[in-house]
Amino acid sequence: MVKHIILWTLRPELSEEEKQTVKAGIKQGLEGLVGKVPGLIEVKVNISGRLASSNADVMLDSTLESPEALKAYSQHPDHVAVANSKVRPYTVSRTCLDFEI
């Protein structure tokens, strides 16, 4: 199995209300991919509880069946649609950590 962890920082020009709306959209979009993308076992998107010591706004914690499933996930049309509509327009940085478990 593979863990796919992403941290995003939202655009600073977004108001707090806009940030909450964007975070909810990211959570709904990514968590909604379970059952649609083969090999995607679990998705958790953390959008709350951020402490002042944090330097990211949103965290994706996902589990996939294999490295091959991760590659297929990254190219899956439903994932690409969520990334292009709910994530990329509103973020300024992305940090990724993929590892086998």
Briefly describe each language-model feature range:
Residues 67-95:
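C-terminal structural segments of small proteins and small subunits
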Residues 1-57, 65-75, 98-101:
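Short S/T/G/P-rich N-terminal loop/turn motif that feeds into the first structured element of a domain
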